[in-house]
UniProtKB/Swiss-Prot annotation:
Catalytic activity as recorded in UniProt: D-cysteine + H2O = hydrogen sulfide + pyruvate + NH4(+) + H(+); 1-aminocyclopropane-1-carboxylate + H2O = 2-oxobutanoate + NH4(+)
Cofactor: pyridoxal 5'-phosphate
Record flagged with keyword Protein biosynthesis: no
Active-site feature positions: 120 (nucleophile)
GO cellular component, one term: nucleus
UniProt-recorded name of the protein: Bifunctional D-cysteine desulfhydrase/1-aminocyclopropane-1-carboxylate deaminase, mitochondrial
Domain of life the protein comes from: Eukaryota
Length: 401
């Protein structure tokens, strides 16, 4: 009986291992299909409810232990790999796009407009998703004043965007600040409408009330993954980067309404926490959620030198994490969030001791290519291989040619 019990335990553990990477895995036939949407029961009171969603991401994404150095005794850190949602579509943005692109198609759009920074992961994902669905894409990309009149090049996300045929419109950071993202996208929309196009506008990061459903769904996905486990794993905290607000609004609301009940910590990489509390509140009000943003998420300032700007300590941390755990963080979002988390833990280790933390990796790997010059000094692990005369050659010892 003891042997049978051990066998059953092994089977349960194997099923749990598999379930953390797969719940009800969609078939390949579902990819790029539009389907009627049914919300989780605990979110069915929200309004308006999406009518459809597109299957664009490779879901569910796996969850596994992540042994970052410096964790307090008894603290467990796990990571949800939303950097595995696809290749060209990798990262958190595709979850929002599943809902936004469905609405674009429902409105018979033939063109999609969105806006972001010069290395925007969201813009890259939007360009790819648009191409998949036979829609044209127009990207308004913010860059420095000195570079706004030059070819933006082919580094990182720009390479993918231009490969898939996106129309890139450059603006300076000063123009972006003085005009605003909404006015800029509306101006381009009016121009394209005069040309006979039917454009659909997606805001920065896909962060509006409809896009918020992407991470409400992610909360349901995490619930289902935990339900498959035999060990009653429950997360005390969820940690995620915050760049435009939609992801933290969705995961915080989903955790609050659903069974997770985890404390959500968002690490902002651009604007300050007060801005994001107000912005998230607007998204929640747009869903008639009836909750206060400050009750469902703790927002920490992790922007450091500024958006997409890094200190040497942050880049060294990204390198150290990759070397010690094999997980590659992007320096703009997840890298700053993980760095911020470790700093918070270091400040008050007792507060985190014994807790089970889930870190959501939001992707952005392509952004590393924009940091090559800054990262180069950290990469010393190479040498010229010694192939002296004593090393045998194919046609005889000591012969070089």
């Amino acid at each position: 009986m003891r042997g049978r019990s051990l066998t059953l335990s092994r089977v349960k553990l194997e099923l749990a291992r598999r379930s953390m990477s797969a719940t009800s895995v969609p078939s390949m036939a579902d990819f790029l299909t539009k389907k009627p949407y049914s919300p989780p029961s605990w979110a069915s009171h929200l309004r308006p409810l999406p009518s459809h969603t597109f299957s664009l991401a490779h879901l569910p994404t796996p969850i596994h232990r992540w042994n970052l150095p410096g964790l307090p005794n008894g603290t467990e850190l796990w990571i949800k790999r939303d950097d595995f949602t696809g290749m060209e579509l990798s990262g958190n943005k595709v979850r929002k796009l599943e809902f936004l692109m469905a609405e674009a198609v429902d409105q018979h759009a033939d063109t999609v407009i969105t806006i972001g920074g010069i290395q925007s992961n969201h813009c890259r994902a939007t360009a790819t998703a648009s191409n998949y669905l036979n829609l044209n894409s127009h990207l308004i990309l913010r860059t420095s004043k000195l570079l706004a009149d030059e070819d933006p090049g082919l580094v990182g996300n720009l390479l993918v965007e231009r490969l898939v045929g996106a129309n890139v419109h450059l603006i300076s950071k000063e123009e972006y600040s003085s005009i605003g993202s909404e006015a800029l996208t509306n101006a381009l929309k009016e121009k394209l409408e005069k040309e006979g196009k039917k454009p659909y506008v997606i805001p920065v990061g896909g962060s509006n009330s409809l896009g918020t459903w992407g991470y409400i769904e992610a909360a349901r996905e995490i619930e289902e993954q935990l339900n498959y486990r035999p060990d009653d794993l429950k997360f005390d905290d969820i940690v995620v980067a915050c760049g435009s607000g939609g992801t933290i609004a969705g995961i915080s609301l989903g955790s609050w309404l659903g069974a997770l009940k985890a404390k959500v910590h968002a690490f902002s990489v651009c604007d300050d926490p007060d801005y994001f509390y107000d912005f998230v509140q607007g998204l929640l009000d747009g869903l008639h959620a009836g909750v206060n943003s400050r009750d469902i998420v703790n927002i920490h300032n992790a922007k450091g030198k500024g958006y997409a700007m890094n200190t040497s300590e942050e880049l060294e941390f990204v390198k150290k994490v990759a070397s010690s755990t094999g997980v590659i963080l992007d320096p703009v979002y997840s890298g700053k969030a993980a760095y911020g988390l470790i700093n918070e833990i270091t400040k008050d280790p007792k507060c985190w001791e014994g807790r089970k933390i889930l870190f959501i990796h939001t992707g952005g790997l392509l952004g590393l290519y924009d940091k090559v010059d800054q990262m180069a000094s950290l990469m010393g692990n190479w040498s010229r291989m010694d192939v002296s005369e004593s090393v045998p050659r194919k046609d005889g010892v000591g012969k070089m040619f």
